[in-house]
Regions:
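N-terminal, polar/Ser/Thr-rich
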Residues: 18-67, 453-454, 458
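A surface-exposed beta-strand-loop module
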Residues: 20-21, 83-84, 89-151, 526-531, ...
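Glycine/proline-rich low-complexity spacer/linker segments in large multi-domain proteins
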Residues: 45, 133-183, 543-556, 560
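Hydrophobic helix-coil surface modules that form long, contiguous segments used
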Residues: 68, 161-162, 173-321, 350
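Acidic/His/Gly-enriched intrinsically disordered linker/tail segments
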Residues: 345-411, 428-431
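Amphipathic alpha-helical substructures
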Residues: 394-482
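C-terminal outer-membrane/trafficking sorting elements
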Residues: 559-570, 574-651
Length: 651
């Protein structure tokens, strides 16, 4: 039974020098050579605002060569560039370039296509159009890029361009910070075998000649370069339907599956519409409701959230939920830079937890979070996003990041937490755009009315986690004190903490939970007004904080074997009388018991109880008016159990 009580809270803090929580992540991954020098925009690229890509490719499976063109349209910002620069790896051959319809000179070196800007001044907002004709055999970009592959001996093409590998197969401004407003993707493949080209957005047309099939897909929602994708194979295609309870709109769910995976994936893929419904209820309507959602199998070990058509290397519910979650967190709102990848991956990991909670309940939710906890070093904010291994660190960018949301949820409560997510998803400046950590923090503060500087400094920019040590004792007359130490060496965490005090009142089991604000090395909290004997104190019993916890000696002598609990005698010191609470577990029944007062030499001064005592909660009182001042002992004996406490009598 949970009880509410009034309590008096005293916080005693030891003043210490605060340790700066921000520090550079020391992890060293196997840096992908394509990423070392290409994780930031050039000065000229930063002056361009891209609005459109038109990608047209012809794919030759025999030679493993692609050829075609990309139209790039955009406008000039406040400052005029010296040249127009676009990313394309050096192994690809640029055949020619047109600038505003006219053939232009260019250079292609250091994985950059450089096109001279006009000599005349270009006004702000000036629109430009560049067409780049090129061909080559795409160089596989570490774990990403354009892949000529096979499945069951049949040719298969797939792409995975995150983080910076769109440049391995098509020229672009390859950075997540600048989304094109729309993209056309036109791909020609051989007619035999019966290839299907699956891509982003809506299929506009499929035309077929004797030797070629040409697919035209169009994405009308803003999209960043790494989310543009191709998946090509003689797929088995089947459809499902999502009917929105939010808007009453209907949307097709398209599944492009390897024929040998059809039966294995079918039942889980059927759950997709239920997941869309859940996430739409929690976050707001599915962001690409006017196009589609779907899956395309590919030969890679995980999944990739390509906009409107996730590439799938498996079909577990966890994977489906994770990649679908990216539709809101990663696709509609994309991290502004890969420093902030947690806004994509941590949110998607948390979507897995929300699906587990929906399917299997609260206990399963907490179990999922515990199974995805991380207690090592490093910051959630990626200090140096130079390689995939650093950016996509599963412990930091996925697991610890999901705990940030888990903790935030408990701090503000469910109503405000999901209002934060809905407000974030519908923010006019962020929806279908890009966001940084500070953008998300601003939304959190605006919706909740709270200051989250400490929270984000600790959990996003700071290292590690709190290690709490708790001890407690009974002061007497219903007063208990709880001491919380922070033992970690990386700085002190400022967090609200649930403290649950449990015990008994006669045969009744009682507990109450209070919230304390903790922020220092050592803090002591005093609680009064409890009308039950406290037998245990637990910090964060439900597991809302990513932490380590240790307990030191408690103030109740819990004898597990005999189930006898003895409270501290109170008040102590005393001047006229003292009392002591004790409890006998009903499971062991009545006991022969003696409670005596002994003087400092161990001689019996008075016998308070010497008879058979029933199980349950009891209080014994000693009136000391006829006794001299000094040190005494109150001793309880039952069978082999003896509890002795020192008491001080003053007059």
């Amino acid at each position: 039974m949970r009880k509410l009580f009034y309590f008096f809270l005293i916080i005693c803090s030891i003043t210490i020098a605060q340790v700066e929580l921000k520090h550079e992540c020391s992890r060293e991954g196997s840096a992908n050579r394509w990423l070392n020098a290409k994780s930031t925009l050039t000065e000229n690229q930063d002056k361009l605002d891209i609005s459109y890509y038109g990608i047209e490719l012809d794919i030759d499976f025999d030679s493993e060569i692609i050829s075609g063109s990309v139209i790039i349209e955009g406008s000039i910002g406040m400052n005029q560039p010296d040249s127009f620069e676009f990313d394309l790896l050096n192994n690809m051959v640029v055949d020619s370039v047109k600038y505003n319809g006219e053939v232009s000179t260019f250079t292609h070196q250091d994985d950059l296509i450089n096109i001279p800007a006009p000599l005349a001044a270009i006004p702000e907002g000036y629109d430009f159009s560049v067409t780049i004709f090129y061909h080559g055999s795409p160089e596989y970009c570490g774990a990403s890029g354009f892949k000529f592959d096979e499945h069951l001996g049949i040719d298969h093409v797939w792409t995975l361009s995150e983080a910076y590998c769109a440049r391995s197969w098509w020229p672009s401004k390859d950075d997540p910070s600048d989304k094109a407003d729309s993209v056309d993707i036109i791909v020609a493949v051989p007619s035999n075998p019966d290839f299907i080209v699956a891509s982003n957005g809506i299929l506009q047309s499929m035309t077929q000649s004797e030797n070629k099939k040409i697919y035209h897909w169009k994405e009308i929602y803003p999209i960043t370069t790494y989310l543009v994708s191709l998946a090509i194979y003689p797929y088995t295609v089947w459809y499902d339907q999502y009917i929105s309870s939010v808007s009453n709109d209907t949307m097709t769910i398209e599944n492009y599956v390897f024929p040998d995976r059809y039966e294995g994936s079918y039942s889980n893929y059927l759950l997709t519409k239920d997941m869309i419904a859940l996430f739409s209820e929690l976050f707001g309507e599915y962001p690409f409701i006017n196009e589609k959602y779907g899956h395309a199998d590919f030969r890679w070990g995980g999944g990739m959230e390509h906009q409107t058509l996730t590439s799938m290397g498996g079909y577990s519910q966890n994977l489906i939920a994770h990649e679908l979650g990216h539709s809101w967190w990663g696709n509609m709102i994309t991290c502004k830079s890969f420093h902030d990848i947690w806004l994509n991956e941590g949110f998607a990991r948390y979507c897995q937890a929300l699906w587990v909670e929906y399917q299997d309940g609260e206990e399963a939710y907490f179990s999922f979070m515990n199974n995805h906890s991380y207690y090592g070093g490093g910051t959630v904010y990626v200090e140096n996003p130079s390689s995939n291994s650093i950016i996509f660190n599963s412990s930091l960018s996925y697991n610890k990041s999901s705990w940030v949301l888990h903790m935030l949820r408990h701090i503000v409560g469910d109503n405000i937490f999901f209002n934060i997510l809905r407000s974030y998803a519908s923010n006019d400046s962020l929806a279908y755009n890009v966001a940084s950590t500070s953008d998300f923090q601003n939304v959190c503060e605006s919706v909740s009315g709270l200051d989250f500087d400490d929270f984000f400094d600790q959990w996003i920019y700071g290292d590690r986690h709190p290690h709490y040590q708790l001890s407690w004792w009974h002061e007497g007359e219903g007063i208990y004190k709880v001491n919380i130490d922070q033992l970690q060496s990386t700085g002190y965490f400022s967090m609200p903490i649930d403290i649950t005090l449990s015990g008994s009142q006669g045969p009744l089991v009682q507990d109450t939970t209070i919230v304390v604000n903790n922020s220092g090395s050592t803090q002591i909290y005093e609680f009064s007004g409890l009308d039950f004997l406290v037998e245990s104190v637990v910090l964060d019993p439900d597991g809302w904080i990513l932490k380590e916890i240790s307990y030191t000696t408690a103030g109740i002598n819990n004898i597990i074997a005999n189930k006898i609990s003895v409270g501290q005698a109170y008040p102590n010191p005393f001047n006229s009388g003292i009392r002591m609470d004790y409890y006998i577990d009903p499971k062991i029944g009545d006991l022969d018991m003696t409670i005596e007062i002994l003087d400092i030499n161990g001689r019996r001064t008075q016998t308070l109880i010497n008879n058979r005592v029933t199980s349950g909660f009891h209080t014994v009182f000693w009136n000391s008016n006829n006794n001299a001042t000094g040190i005494y002992f109150i001793q309880l004996s039952a069978a082999d159990f003896i509890s002795t406490q020192k008491i001080v009598h003053l007059k």
